[in-house]
Amino acid sequence: MEEKHIETIARGVCISDGKVLLCMPKDRSYSYLPGGHIEFGETGREALVREMKEETGLDATAGELLGVVESSFVQKGERHCEINLIYEMKIESKSEVEVGQRTVQSLESWICFDWVPCDKIDSANLLPPEMKPYCHTGKN
């Protein structure tokens, strides 16, 4: 039997001009906060900064830990369990992207990023939905 494990993920809330940065798989109808898996030996903040650099080429700063969201779901017929560490996030590379004004370019072919108005977060199908409160103010 394949050993199962709980995935630990660092996610960032970047809010600018009333918009929150979200990530979307190109072949799906949902969104999630940017970030990714924490690798052994790194902190959540380090993982968030690394993932943003890998996925967008942009330098980010991970700030205050805003909260923790647990999630359990089935994807492609397989049960997944994850713990999401949610941090404040700022994008440092303002010369490359006007924060909040235009789409952040993805370096990965299967995802895209977009700035979504905080008051439209309910229509963004954010998963897990327990993350929605952080997208309005950065705080739960």
Language model: regions and residue ranges:
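Conserved N-terminal beta-strand and adjoining loop/helix that marks the start
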Residues: 1-20, 88
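A short coil-to-beta-strand element that immediately follows conserved catalytic motifs
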Residues: 59-68
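Conserved Nudix-box catalytic region and its N-terminal flanking loop in Nudix hydrolases
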Residues: 16-54
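Short loop segments at secondary-structure junctions
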Residues: 17-19, 90-95, 118-120
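Active-site-adjacent beta-strand/loop module that shapes the phosphate/pyrophosphate-binding cleft
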Residues: 73-99
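Conserved hydrophobic/aromatic beta-strand scaffold that supports enzyme active sites
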Residues: 22, 68, 86-88, 115
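Short connector loops at helix/strand junctions that flank enzyme active sites
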Residues: 7, 15, 33, 60, ...
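NUDIX/MutT-family hydrolases
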Residues: 88, 99-135
